[in-house]
A protein has these predicted regions:
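Compositionally biased intrinsically disordered regions enriched in Thr/Gly
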Residues: 4-159
Length: 159
């Protein structure tokens, strides 16, 4: 058998000083199927620092839980609109500890900002089986408006 590993990074700028890099690591090690893992980094060129929710949110805990709630709602909508999953609930599709996983979106998973808002990607196996693939959620800045700190608004160019 053979193995294959590919790495790809996509830098996308959102302003003159802030950009994010989305990296996906694809590997096939001879098993039943390959695996792809997503990573994201948000970087402020002016400060020379990686951006985290702690720097961007007025109350990081409240923001993190609010986005977890929003992910849950969007996930339910995605399941309801997928014909193969008709009649299934979140607990039928996702692992038993899905809520715990959702609440760690900002620290353990690929969360990135682009010109339109926040995107959170959970790689295959993080929320559900390989057959369900990566789970991706997007939230426009307007939906998150009440959670940003003043400095977060400035860094993201939301003023």
């Amino acid at each position: 058998f053979y193995t294959l590993s590919l790495h790809d990074a996509l830098p996308i700028y959102i302003s003159g000083s802030v950009f994010y890099v989305l990296l996906y690591d694809y590997s096939y090690l001879g098993g039943a199927h390959p695996n792809t893992v997503y990573f994201a980094w948000n970087y402020d060129l002016d400060s020379g620092m990686f951006l985290t929710i702690s720097e961007l949110a007025a109350d990081p805990q409240t923001f993190t839980l609010a986005v977890a709630d929003m992910i849950e709602v969007q996930a339910e909508e995605q399941i309801a609109s997928t014909p193969e999953l008709e009649g299934r609930s979140l607990s039928d599709v996702y692992w038993d500890n899905y809520r715990e996983t959702l609440e760690k979106w900002s620290s353990d998973y690929a969360a990135s900002f682009d010109a339109d808002g926040l995107t959170v990607i959970f790689s295959a196996y993080e929320l559900a089986s390989y057959a369900n693939g990566p789970q991706e959620f997007h939230f426009p800045y307007a939906a998150l408006d009440s959670y940003w700190s003043d400095s977060g608004r400035a860094v993201l160019g939301l003023d």
